[in-house]
Design a protein with these regions (language model features):
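Histidine-acidic metal/acid-base catalytic patches
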Residues: 1, 131-263
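Hydrophobic faces of well-ordered beta-strands that scaffold small-molecule active sites
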Residues: 5-7, 34-39, 73-75, 111-113, ...
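Active-site acidic/histidine proton-transfer and metal-coordination neighborhood
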Residues: 28-30, 48-147, 157, 168, ...
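Catalytic domains of carbohydrate-active enzymes, especially glycoside hydrolases
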Residues: 1-10, 68-69
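Conserved, mostly hydrophobic/aromatic
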Residues: 5, 27, 54, 65, ...
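Catalytic-core regions built around general acid/base machinery
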Residues: 19-30, 99-104, 165, 219-223
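Acidic-and-aromatic substrate-binding clefts and catalytic sites of carbohydrate-active enzymes
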Residues: 8-22, 42-49, 80-84, 119-128, ...
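N-terminal small/glycine-rich loop or linker at the start of catalytic domains
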Residues: 35-45, 80, 193-201
Length: 263
C-alpha cells in the first residue's frame, strides 16, 4: 500500500509528450500521485554548449514533472571527469542549477540534489559523490525551491557514513530515497576500482530489502523527525520481486508510524 509513484524521465513512453497527461490520469485513477521525478543532468562538462543543452533538458524534465502533477524534480552535479577541479565542477554545477531555478519556480517545482553514485548511462562517477564536494555544492545554492533528496545507501558507496552526511545536511532534506544496498561479492574498495571505464553501475552492486541492509533507519528517522522533515519517502526496491517490495513497504510503514504517528 503506497501513496504515490516516483517517475523516471527516461521511460521510453515519455518521449511522446502526449502520454504525460495519460499517465497522470491513470495513476490518479488508482488514488495515487506522481510527486517526484528522477532524472540525471550532467552539469560538469567543460564545454559551455554541452552544459546549455543539459539545462534545456532539465527544463523539459521540470515541465514533465509539472504535467504529471509532481512537485519535486531531481538534479545531479554531473560526471567526475578527469582533469576537472573541485572548484570548476562546483561552479559549473551551481551555475546550471541556478539557471534552472526560475523555470522551476514558475512551474511550482522544487529541485532536489542527490548525492548519487553513478547514473546508468555515465562513464564516470558522480562529481559530488564525496561528502565534502556535495556540501560545497549545496552551500553554493540557496533557494526555497532547492533542497536535498537524501539517499543513505549512496554514502556507503563513497566509503562514507550516511549518518555523518545526514547530520550535516538534515535541515535541507526535503525528500528521501529509502534503500538498502549490499555488495554481492568483494568489498567497497573493489567497487571503487570499477567506478571508471564501465558505463553504469558495477556488476557487483545490488539493491537489498529495506531494513535488512547496512542502513540504521531508527537513527535516520530520529534525525529527520528532529529537523521537522515531512516530505515524500520514495522506496528503491523491487528488483527481486514484488514480495520483497511488499516487505520493504511494510517495514517503512511501521517506521513512519513510529516516528510520525500523525500520519
Amino acid at each position: 500500500d503506497i501513496d504515490g509513484l516516483e517517475w523516471y524521465a527516461g521511460f521510453i513512453e515519455m518521449q511522446d509528450e502526449s502520454n504525460w497527461k495519460k499517465f497522470r490520469k491513470q495513476v490518479e485513477m488508482h488514488g495515487k500521485t506522481i510527486p517526484m521525478m528522477c532524472c540525471s543532468p550532467d552539469f560538469t562538462h567543460p564545454d559551455p554548449s554541452f552544459r546549455l543543452n543539459e539545462i534545456t533538458k532539465q527544463k523539459k524534465w521540470i515541465f514533465m514533472t509539472s504535467t504529471l502533477g509532481g512537485t519535486y524534480c531531481r538534479v545531479l552535479s554531473g560526471q567526475r571527469r578527469p582533469g576537472l577541479s573541485v572548484e570548476e565542477g562546483v561552479s559549473f554545477a551551481a551555475d546550471c542549477i541556478y539557471k534552472c531555478l526560475p523555470y522551476a519556480k514558475e512551474q511550482g517545482i522544487t529541485l532536489i540534489l542527490e548525492k548519487h553514485y553513478k547514473d546508468d548511462f555515465w562513464v564516470y562517477p558522480e562529481f559530488a559523490q564525496k561528502m565534502d564536494v556535495f556540501c560545497k555544492l549545496l552551500d553554493k545554492v540557496n533557494d526555497e525551491h532547492f533542497g536535498v533528496n537524501y539517499d543513505p545507501s549512496n554514502a556507503f558507496l563513497a566509503g562514507e557514513d550516511p549518518l555523518e552526511l545526514l547530520y550535516k545536511i538534515s535541515a535541507r532534506v526535503v525528500t528521501m530515497h529509502a534503500s538498502d544496498r549490499y555488495l554481492k561479492e568483494g568489498t567497497i574498495e573493489d567497487l571503487r576500482k570499477e567506478e571508471v571505464g564501465a558505463t553504469g553501475y558495477a556488476k557487483r552492486l545490488a539493491h537489498g530489502e529495506i531494513g535488512k541492509g547496512l542502513n540504521n533507519y531508527d537513527a535516520i528517522f530520529t534525525e529527520l523527525k528532529k529537523v521537522g522533515f515531512n516530505g515524500w519517502i520514495s522506496i528503491e526496491d523491487g528488483v527481486d520481486g514484488l514480495e520483497q517490495l511488499e516487505r520493504s513497504v511494510s517495514f517503512l510503514r511501521k517506521k513512519i508510524k513510529q516516528y510520525w504517528p500523525e500520519h
